[in-house]
A protein has these predicted regions:
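Phosphate-handling DNA/RNA-contact segment within nucleic-acid enzymes
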Residues: 1-74, 92
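TOPRIM fold recognition
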Residues: 44-138
Length: 138
């Protein structure tokens, strides 16, 4: 007697093929024509407490091929606000992403953050300063 599998997985397991908060914030992202990408979910929640809803999180420090497709399909400006010390220019998938959408990023040139801080960790005023000084990734 041939036994059939109990479960069949049509998608590979163990991959991160989602962006935290995207589904909940899609309307705000469309309204602003911009998505701010954080590393962690906590930053998305903190930004929301300040009334900033066009945000989502990678849940890691780099963009994988699945997330690249998701961001490219959005067709809006992507602002990377990753933790201090993460250089987006070293990420091959972010380099690919700039072929499809405008990519900007937060860079703490004035040393306002502690090591490994998210751009929102030091409060709303510092976040605003960092966001207003964001750079265009050419």
């Amino acid at each position: 007697e041939k036994k059939l599998r109990k479960y069949t997985y049509f998608k590979p397991l163990g991959i991160l093929d989602t962006i935290y908060g995207l589904a909940e914030n899609r309307d705000y992202i469309a309204l602003k024509n911009e998505i701010i990408i954080f590393e962690g979910a906590k930053s998305v929640m903190l930004a929301a407490s300040w009334g900033i809803y066009n945000t989502a999180a990678l849940l890691t420090s780099h963009v994988n091929p699945y997330q690249l497709k998701i961001l490219a399909k959005l067709g809006c400006r992507v602002v990377f606000a990753l933790d201090k010390g993460i250089n987006i220019r070293e990420d091959e998938n972010i380099k690919r992403l700039k072929r499809y959408v405008r990519v900007e990023y937060i860079w703490d040139k004035d040393d306002l953050l502690q090591e490994k801080d998210s751009p929102v960790d030091q409060g709303q005023e510092i976040w605003r300063t960092l966001y207003e000084g964001r750079l265009y990734y050419r």
